[in-house]
């Protein structure tokens, strides 16, 4: 099966252990993780893959971005299945955690990616407190 936003939204809502709200559009899903402080996960669909991401904090909230970036690069391996990046939203830059999957991934693999991303995002959000002003 090749996933699209509607098919994945339908499948995710049938998984009983997932307490989520899903909003879908033509090329994306927005998932609210109700058991994780309403953390928002975005799933963007391209012609070959889906990119799963969440925002951590504005870059401007970090007191020493160079030091924080060095920490992230040195410790990236501690976040399985996820990467950290910077993305611009309405002219402000944010740290994000993201992962990518094939459109042909199993629902089990997608759920693993989402779960890992949420865990990694929460861990990183906690770490940012040490670097915030």
Swiss-Prot record:
Instruction: Give the Pfam families listed for this entry.
Output: DUF2170
Q: Which InterPro entries match?
A: DUF2170
Please identify the protein, giving its name as recorded.
Uncharacterized protein YjfI
Gene name of this polypeptide: yjfI
């Amino acid at each position: 099966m090749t996933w699209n936003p509607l098919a994945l939204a339908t499948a995710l809502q049938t998984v009983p252990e997932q307490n989520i709200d899903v909003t879908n559009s033509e090329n994306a899903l927005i998932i609210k993780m109700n058991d994780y402080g309403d953390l928002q996960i975005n799933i963007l669909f391209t012609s070959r893959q889906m990119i799963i991401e969440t925002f951590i904090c504005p870059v401007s909230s970090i007191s020493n971005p160079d030091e924080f970036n060095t920490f992230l690069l040195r410790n990236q391996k501690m976040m399985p299945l996820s990467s950290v990046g910077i993305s611009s939203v309405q002219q402000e830059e944010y740290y994000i955690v993201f992962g990518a999957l094939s459109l042909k991934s199993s629902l089990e693999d997608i759920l693993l990616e989402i779960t890992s991303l949420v865990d990694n995002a929460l861990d990183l959000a906690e770490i940012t407190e040490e670097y915030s002003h």
